[in-house]
Amino acid sequence: LTVAAASLTLACVGTPEIPFPESGFEDVTPPADGRSDEFSPDNPPWGILGAVGVWVMSFVFMFVTQLAFIIGYLLYRHADLAAVGEIVMKDPMAIFVAILSLVPAHQLTIVLAWMLVTGNGKRPFLRTLGWDWGRGFTFWRSAGLAVALLLAGAGIIKLTGSTETELDRLIESSRAAALATAFLATVTAPFVEEVIYRGVLYSAIRRAAGRGVAVAIVVLLFAAIHVPQYWPSFGVIGTILLLSLVLTLIRAHTGRLLPCFIVHLVFNGIQSVLIVLNPYLEHVSPPTTPTEPGAMLHVLVQLFIPHVRLF
């Protein structure tokens, strides 16, 4: 029902004129789900300064928690604090403790991101970030894309050659370190990274500078922070750059964060499963050449295990 008149008067009681919108009641009716069009994932209520602040603090949290955990471990062992550098490099348990310290660092990062995105609880966290599928994406399409990225990465590494990286040495330092790496790479890292890079950072940069600039900056930032742990393996760095590009383009195309998270989760999760199963697969895989039957599993394990991405 649309009210065309500019006003109505109840003559019997002398009611003063009450103005109504000429376009109709539907224009002043709030959305049924309570959502406001004022903000969206591409028009966020936070700016670049807040986004960069959360990004910087994510590194501060990692540094502080790692330092606290390592010092606590050294005090427990009654070790010389002056030799902390040497102990951390050579003690497998110290390496495990350093990896484990990233769990509270990730938790603190999410808390800070929540404060920025929600305005301290005034807005819904996930919905403000765009936590739904968007155009053309489902769980299985996202998972299939993750598998395709893994295969593409395997091809890149095969062509460029595999060089031992810092993360390789970390995973190989102990079984505990390998399992902790697999846990973080699956349970916390995909969610934290997507919230920070494709959620908080991308949204703020896109609003301020446009989609193209936002894509370029986020792709490069995400890839750049992984270079130290994968240097000097250019194949792995290239794979991470490809992953970063695809995830950011998905965010730009759909305006949503959930597909990025699922691709990231499956990409890391498959490699984490291989890390967990690696000791058992080594026992069942015969030491044969790649051309013989059954050897491909061994080749894939050896190809993927050293290159799981953690942060």
Outline where the language-model segments fall.
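N-terminal, membrane-interfacial amphipathic/helix-forming hydrophobic leader that caps
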Residues: 1-128, 154, 272-311
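Transmembrane helix-loop-helix hairpins at the membrane interface
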Residues: 14, 20-24, 35-37, 59-62, ...
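Helix-boundary and loop/linker segments of multi-pass membrane transporters
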Residues: 40-44, 87-89, 130-134, 168-177, ...
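Residue-level signature of transmembrane alpha-helical entry/exit and packing/kink sites
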Residues: 47-54, 94-102, 138, 142, ...
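Generic structural microfeature
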Residues: 99, 123-125, 138, 200, ...
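Generic alpha-helical secondary structure signal
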Residues: 123, 137-138, 165, 177
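Interfacial segments of alpha-helical transmembrane regions
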Residues: 130-148
